[in-house]
Regions:
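Structural alpha/beta surface segment adjacent to cysteine/selenocysteine redox centers
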Residues: 20-124
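Extreme N-terminus of proteins, especially the signal/transit-peptide cleavage junction
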Residues: 1-2, 29
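Conserved redox-active cysteine motifs that mediate thiol-disulfide chemistry
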Residues: 10-20
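Acyltransferase
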Residues: 125-132, 137, 142
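Conserved small/polar residues in nucleotide/adenosyl-binding loops
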Residues: 147-154
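Short active-site neighborhood of thiol/selenol oxidoreductases, capturing the structured segment around
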Residues: 2-11
């Protein structure tokens, strides 16, 4: 068995692309078992707890809306190659990803980490949901089959 520790942030589009590429690579080695453990990494550890307006964030990070558009056009194109149809225009808030990482840690203990990570990426990058919002995280947890009580305990505490 090959054990993989992957450091990733739930608000990083390159991490989503990387996950898809890793899945393809693993599928080419059907005779090998892989154990993936997704480890937390925050791209923006100083992000306010409630996140910030997406456009303000992009301008502060890349210097201008035009620079951000150029970068995200490239990310969009790379995503399409991997079967991801990023919907960046639907993202209104760049969230603080801390609580999404807490949810992933619980998911690991329950053998659901891959499912939760997929749901986090899809919720944020495809649906524009604020994955820093405890209610969104709770919905994701319940959808992936946590009991409501356990999910509520993790997300709200």
């Amino acid at each position: 068995m090959i054990e993989l520790d992957i450091f990733s942030d739930t608000v990083c589009p390159w991490c989503y692309i990387g996950k898809k590429r890793l899945e393809k690579a693993i599928s080419n080695h059907k005779d090998t078992k892989f154990k993936q453990t997704w480890r937390p990494f925050q791209l923006n550890p100083g992000m306010p707890p409630d996140g910030m307006d997406r456009q303000e964030y992009l301008i502060s990070k890349f210097g201008s809306a035009d620079a951000a558009k150029t970068i995200y056009d490239n990310i969009y194109d790379e995503g399409l190659v991997e079967g991801i149809n990023f919907n960046f225009d639907s993202i209104m808030t760049t969230p603080n990803s801390f609580n999404s990482h807490r949810l992933l840690a619980l998911a690991y203990k329950q053998g659901l980490q891959e499912n939760v990570l997929d749901s986090l990426f899809e919720s944020y990058f495809l649906n524009g949901e604020d994955i820093g919002d405890p209610n969104v995280l709770l919905d994701i947890a319940i959808t992936v089959s946590y009991t409501h009580l356990r999910a509520h305990e993790t997300v709200m505490n």
